Amino acid sequence: MVWERRRAMLILGAAVCGFLLDLLLGDPEWMPHPVVLMGKIISRAEGTLRRRFPPTPGGEIAAGTILAALLPLGTLAFCGGVCFLALCIHPALCFAVQTLWCWQALAMRGLLQESAAVQRQLERENLPAARAAVGRIVGRDTDRLTAEGVIRAAVETVAENFCDGVAAPLLYMFLGGAPLALAYKAVNTKIGRAS
């Protein structure tokens, strides 16, 4: 019972510290990011699996299923193992690792910065710059959007990215710490690359 309480406090503390670090620092460009690594792993694994399975609908389904299962499970196992080893060395090291990964699993500051850039350009009534700003956060052509279209695209993207980049990772952090949050990010990254 005492261990479970300590584990819960470690996870809660790491999630709160990670959230605050994300708000303060965002994603520094110099820091390697797990989602970038996940994207590289997905690219390599897709190529390998496509060579090993026949180029038929059934082969693609089998390869996709294997990748969809192995990426989050591998992420969970690796991150969980690192956290366990860190805990064996010292609880403070485990807390530091969990905090770092919680920070990297979140995207609140980036979302705030990008949406504020759209708002600034709209307030200046600079529609071409507002289109360019919203184009950095949406996956569609923004060249012909009206001001209302820019607002709609920004609101839709902020809502979706808040769920994907803030709310869901926090939920998974509270359920299973940084390893589970990063496993969620692995699933989300795979889905994002598939669409």
Predicted regions and their residues:
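Hydrophobic alpha-helical transmembrane segments
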Residues: 4-182, 187
